[in-house]
């Protein structure tokens, strides 16, 4: 048994390149089922965020496929075009990377808080789809536990640590007040809700975009307005 990892992130690729390899929750579930069906694959987890896409695979001795080639085939793209943006890790290197990553030490904003939830959600999805295995279960749970310890014991991780908090602190440092200002948040996912709540705390007038086909059921943070995504420029 062993662990392989392959990934693309903000440190090596711009957002337009990273977006080529991004997964929705549904896409990730379908991809994991196909990957797990490959010979030698015991389990797999897909971690896909705005800053990275990473695949973690628990493998048996008969494993022989290239994770990178498999990913490119699934995305319907030429492998050679993007190979330089990817990093591959195996066994100890893959484990160490996940521990550092979960602790926020490889984030654009050092020690940001969202990554722990994203790692937990990635494992939860793999578990729901019966695509993980005992090795990956233990690895991801240990990484989350270690990350929580870092958050509680390391000084630089105390306080709010997200991209939006950093942006707000930067604006306030320049003497700019958000009170009464019109702010639009594109999207109502986890990061969108975090952004909307942070802006509301600064007494901004916040509007959140939602997709029209979801507008009848989606919930937005209290005190925020909503607008269909297609009408955002009007």
Task: Write out the residue ranges for each language-model feature.
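Short acidic low-complexity segments
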Residues: 222-234
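Short, charged/polar "capping" segments at the starts of alpha-helices
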Residues: 63, 193, 213-219
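Glycine/serine-rich phosphate-binding loop and adjoining beta1-alpha1 elements at the start
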Residues: 81-174
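Glycine-rich adenosine-cofactor-binding loop
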Residues: 143, 159-164, 168-200, 208-211
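A glycine-rich (often HGG/GG-containing) alpha/beta subdomain
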Residues: 1-107
């Amino acid at each position: 048994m062993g662990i392989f990892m392959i990934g693309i992130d903000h440190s090596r690729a711009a957002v337009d390149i990273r977006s080529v390899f991004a997964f929705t929750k549904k896409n990730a579930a379908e991809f994991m089922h196909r990957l797990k069906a490959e010979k030698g694959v015991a389990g797999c987890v897909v971690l896909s965020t705005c800053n990275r896409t990473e695949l973690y695979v628990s493998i048996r001795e008969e494993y022989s496929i290239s994770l990178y080639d498999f990913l490119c085939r699934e995305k319907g793209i030429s492998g050679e075009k993007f190979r330089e943006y990817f990093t591959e890790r195996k066994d100890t290197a893959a484990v160490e990377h996940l521990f550092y990553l979960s602790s926020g030490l490889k984030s654009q904003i050092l020690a940001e808080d969202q990554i722990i939830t994203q790692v937990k959600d990635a494992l939860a999805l793999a578990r729901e789809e019966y695509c993980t295995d005992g090795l990956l279960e233990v690895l991801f749970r240990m990484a989350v536990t270690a990350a929580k310890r870092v958050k509680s014991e390391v000084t630089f991780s105390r306080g709010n640590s997200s991209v939006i908090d950093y942006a707000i602190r930067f604006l306030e440092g320049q003497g700019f007040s958000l009170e009464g200002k019109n702010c639009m948040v594109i999207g109502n996912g986890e990061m969108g809700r975090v952004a909307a709540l942070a802006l509301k705390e600064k007494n901004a007038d916040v509007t959140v975009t939602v997709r029209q086909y979801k507008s009848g059921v989606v919930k937005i943070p209290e005190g925020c307005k909503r607008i269909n995504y297609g009408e955002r420029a009007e």
